[in-house]
């Protein structure tokens, strides 16, 4: 989780100007609509929709925006989005997985390929790097819901594989097929999590020097700036000095 979490921390520290925030809201709304279309518009019966709503709340997305995105799915309005996964390499041989939702596969493929190329990376064939990652569930809680030992005990008892606790909170990792049961057990005990969902977790992370790290950060930023891209997962770890520098 190191690389992915480090990069997200950098983006949060940088803050978001209105234009970027609008793009974030647009992507969150798209995920809410897609999740509601694929399942039920009731988040209590649709784990993916519930995760999307939690993500939207974490970004302070207005309640009206969330409700409109759900209604769009219920009313059958809007585009039908196809979910696509891209894989590629960045500077230093780092591996990246890109998740996108698109109504035009050719446009998105071209945009993602261009983003890789412009920033010193290369788009690869499907399956080229996925074997370096595991599909896992993640449930994150605020630090004050429990101490580290209590969270670890509860998570292991629920069937989780790992827990990382620090001053920022608790992050519980579990196998994809155990995600539903683990989520239900932990939420029943500790309440609503900060965020939850399925992610791609690197099996191992590679350390990169700061020069390469800056190039990789720029690559991820360019990819995430594409309208159709929802998530980017990486397998590199940055030095703490670079994290502080880029997040300042």
From Swiss-Prot:
Coiled-coil regions, chain positions: none
Primary residence: cytoplasm
GO molecular function, one term: DNA binding
Keyword DNA-binding recorded: yes
Alphabetically ordered keywords of this record: Cytoplasm, DNA-binding, Transcription, Transcription regulation
Family matches, as InterPro entries: Integrase-like_N (IPR017856), TACO1_YebC-like_2nd/3rd_dom (IPR048300), TACO1_YebC_N (IPR049083), Transcrip_reg_TACO1-like (IPR002876), Transcrip_reg_TACO1-like_dom3 (IPR026564), YebC-like (IPR029072)
Keyword Transcription applies: yes
Any GO BP: regulation of DNA-templated transcription
GO cellular component assignments: cytosol
Cellular compartment(s): Cytoplasm
A Pfam family assignment: TACO1_YebC_N
Protein family: Belongs to the TACO1 family.
Name the record gives this protein: Probable transcriptional regulatory protein Mchl_0946
Organism of origin: Methylorubrum extorquens (strain CM4 / NCIMB 13688)
